[in-house]
């Protein structure tokens, strides 16, 4: 996963 990947 990338540094910032908000999984909703």
From Swiss-Prot:
The modification Leucine amide is found at residue 8. GO terms for biological process: neuropeptide signaling pathway. Keywords: Amidation, Neuropeptide, Secreted. One of its GO terms (cellular component) is extracellular region. Its main location: secreted. It is found in: Secreted. Myoactive. Belongs to the pyrokinin family. This is Pyrokinin-3. It comes from Namaquaphasma ookiepense (Gladiator bug).
């Amino acid at each position: 996963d990338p540094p910032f990947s908000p999984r909703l």
